[in-house]
């Protein structure tokens, strides 16, 4: 597989440091508010990427962090708790971390290898800062804050393709109090009365954002690891500063081989943001659409390009999801009607080949999703009509390939139906088949209507009848 590496601005063959082991880190949320569909795009992409690697035989160690102490969290605590904020601020990140896990489950995102929190790793961060000060890459300000000195690192700006001179020209003429250079950034922030704090050799305070991710990623994955990812808005300054810190601490040019970034989510051409009032939370979206619909909607845009969010796209994706389930349900039943040998060749292999070819070319999910959906429609329009002309082995092979493709996209995650429901529906369908043979069509139609009322749709193919479930109804 070739993947675009932001660090080199090139498509590169994806090769891990350890064969069949992929180690990756994705910057997680700052849990001060509800996760929105823009967050969902990032984590669904890396979930699909992880699923693809696992399908290729890799063990994947994916780490996602939580920045569970931050100015935004402190401000939200003050809004909610007033004078009690100092004691109750942890309730804010705990609430939104719980929501993150709930929404991840509803989006069928597989659990990460680890979910480190900043507040659980402060001691390690203090240790890093000590080392950076000793090496001459960091300095202490009069108020006790500690800053990283950007000018001490060769080739600063390598990830974002910016020269330090150009960055300086765009920065403030006078640095903030305590800074030697406007581009220098905080490794340790001094305590402000009323805010949470931790002990350090310099002053009570808390870690800086850029330090946090590099400490937690390397703690869980080692140095160097295979890929580091996040939204495109993190390229500068966050990921640029992570590289600078790691270069100073470890003496390596790049502590991750591939830097993978996901494009913005837009609404009517504008970036989704709280300041513009155009944010759609995942809870809101998932109250109207299935997790598979959101995954398919994300897949229809290439990960590196901006994605225009609209309910029209989600409507289309929901219909695609229904078709995908129909193909699965009915082909699973049709296997029993297949013959002993192939009397007719079916051209389903091209969908499979082009699906994987698309993913191998910079993980092009729009083309992959198109091929997978094409196979679903081919199953319904052709395979089911010719099931008696192909062998059971061929039918099972088609079903197996279909499920493998679906598992990479994560769009057949509700395929299991309770056994007692399956048996009851099957019995009703058998009774209806007898009624049709006896030409008792009014009673047969009555059974069809009653089944439809509980979310079971019947499709007749001559004398054969297959059924599919409308997921999300009371059957589930």
Curated annotation (Swiss-Prot):
Gene Ontology annotations for the cellular component aspect, listed alphabetically: cytoplasm
Q: Which residues take part in binding Zn(2+)?
A: 27, 213, 238, 242
Q: Which cofactor does it need?
A: Zn(2+)
Main location per the UniProt record:
cytoplasm
The short sequence motif called 'HIGH' region sits at 29-39
Q: Identify the CDD domains for this entry.
A: CysRS_core
Domain of life from the UniProt record: Archaea
Q: Where does ATP bind?
A: 274
Coordinates of motif 'KMSKS' region in the sequence?
271-275
Q: What is its EC number?
A: 6.1.1.16
SMART domains on file:
DALR_2 (SM00840)
**This protein's UniProt keywords:** Aminoacyl-tRNA synthetase, ATP-binding, Cytoplasm, Ligase, Metal-binding, Nucleotide-binding, Protein biosynthesis, Zinc
Question: Single Gene Ontology BP term?
Answer: cysteinyl-tRNA aminoacylation
Q: Which InterPro entries match?
A: Cys-tRNA-ligase, Cys-tRNA-synt_Ia_DALR, Cys-tRNA/MSH_ligase, Rossmann-like_a/b/a_fold, tRNA-synt_1_cat_dom, tRNAsynth_Ia_anticodon-bd
The GO terms this record gives for MF are: ATP binding; cysteine-tRNA ligase activity; zinc ion binding
What's its catalytic activity?
tRNA(Cys) + L-cysteine + ATP = L-cysteinyl-tRNA(Cys) + AMP + diphosphate
Q: Which SUPFAM superfamilies match?
A: Anticodon-binding domain of a subclass of class I aminoacyl-tRNA synthetases, Nucleotidylyl transferase
Kindly give the Pfam families that the UniProt entry links to this protein.
DALR_2, tRNA-synt_1e
Relay the cofactor remark from the entry: Binds 1 zinc ion per subunit.
Entry's localization field: Cytoplasm
State the similarity comment: Belongs to the class-I aminoacyl-tRNA synthetase family.
Q: Give the protein name, as stated in the record.
A: Cysteine--tRNA ligase
